[in-house]
């Protein structure tokens, strides 16, 4: 028994199949033209940027040659005669990172609750606060450091304030998202027995999100330890000042020693904070 012949597809059938699987039919002429125009525009923009910044193969080659000379002068690494100042600067950077991140944590916790949609239900207030977080997150720590150096003078206080100002919005946004993702049933149970809004936050939301908050604090502290090493370049204290001074006088062996010290310090903090974060998340 032979199968009945299948009717050829109509133009409507072909159009429907093309709409569902456009890649199976290849690119249409208008789409191909748009793709070519996009590639040409991207290439023209790239060439324009290379011309604007005067990026040439000769400049790159000369720069790499100079970099190789500096790398050769870095070995062997040496702390020099002022190794105590280097260690003090490293300890100062770690302390700046901790104090700045901790101050940001204290301020960001209430802001995180205010920015959470399940705590503040007013759409305008929620939108305004979230956009404020986004705006503050766009300001780099170095800009804050330059501002606070001018306001309070040289030294670690400017670095602490810069880290704090830069981290408040970052932590507040992370906290708000964690609060919004918390299980609402605990808060609903507290509200069902007559608990106030503050009690719902204290006993329904905070126990769930506190481990996440502390984990984020540790992660940002680790990240800010690296950032604090750079803030000293603009006068905000820490090991960055030691790096800047030695680069000026071209003590490249001491520069490498400081870089290795920063690497070791960050590695130790990373290992410790990773273990603590794992326990916090497991406990949460």
In which residue ranges do the predicted regions lie?
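N-terminal, non-cleaved signal-anchor transmembrane helix
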Residues: 1-102, 109, 114, 118, ...
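Hydrophobic alpha-helical elements at and bordering transmembrane segments
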Residues: 71, 86, 90, 94, ...
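Membrane-embedded alpha-helices of multi-pass transport/permease systems
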Residues: 107-113, 143, 158-161, 165-179, ...
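Cytoplasmic-entry segments and transmembrane alpha-helices of multi-pass inner-membrane transporters
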Residues: 111-145, 174-177
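Generic hydrophobic transmembrane alpha-helix motif, especially the helices
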Residues: 133-167
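Glycine-rich helix-loop "coupling/hinge" segments at transmembrane-helix boundaries
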Residues: 150, 226-262, 281-284
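Short helix-to-coil transition segments within interhelical loops
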Residues: 182-209, 236
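Transmembrane alpha-helices
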Residues: 197-231, 253-265, 269, 273
